[in-house]
UniProtKB/Swiss-Prot annotation:
Organism encoding this protein: Streptococcus pneumoniae serotype 2 (strain D39 / NCTC 7466)
Protein name: Large ribosomal subunit protein uL18
Highest taxon in the source lineage: Bacteria
GO cellular component: cytosolic large ribosomal subunit
Ranges of biased composition (kind: Basic residues): 10-20
Lineage, highest ranks first: Bacteria, Bacillati, Bacillota, Bacilli, Lactobacillales
SUPFAM superfamilies: Translational machinery components
GO molecular function: 5S rRNA binding; structural constituent of ribosome
Keyword Cell wall biogenesis/degradation among UniProt keywords: no
Subunit structure: Part of the 50S ribosomal subunit; part of the 5S rRNA/L5/L18/L25 subcomplex. Contacts the 5S and 23S rRNAs.
Length: 118
């Protein structure tokens, strides 16, 4: 019987490969995206210091309504606002091994519209 590939393991493998080449600094931190079946999470991370500078997710009260794509747009807007409040305008986008499509793209577009450059 042919075994079916585990999509999450393949995603984690892609993410590890990309993370070897991608790093966030204090000047240009990394915007990391994690997507689950029920929600989406975004963090602005300074990898040099190992500190999360700003974050937003569907667990926040402002975001919990709407479809998954609408929630991703709201998370992108919220993380951009929180990053701008801390003086962060440029980031490196880390899609977390996910395709740049759907909820990940919606979050990225919303973050760009609200002032983050990447």
């Amino acid at each position: 019987m042919i075994s079916k590939p585990d999509k999450n393991k393949l995603r984690q493998k892609r993410h590890r490969r990309v993370r070897g080449k991608l790093s966030g600094t204090a000047d240009r931190p990394r915007l990391n995206v994690f997507r689950s079946n029920t929600g989406i999470y975004a963090q602005v991370i300074d990898d040099v210091a190992g500190v999360t500078l700003a974050s937003a997710s569907t667990l926040d009260k402002e975001v919990s309504k709407g479809t998954k794509t609408e929630q991703a747009v709201a998370v992108g807007k919220l993380v951009a606002e929180r990053a701008n409040a801390k003086g962060i305008s440029e980031v490196v986008f880390d899609r977390g091994g996910y395709l740049y499509h759907g909820r990940v793209k919606a979050l990225a577009d919303a973050a760009r519209e609200n002032g983050l450059k990447f």
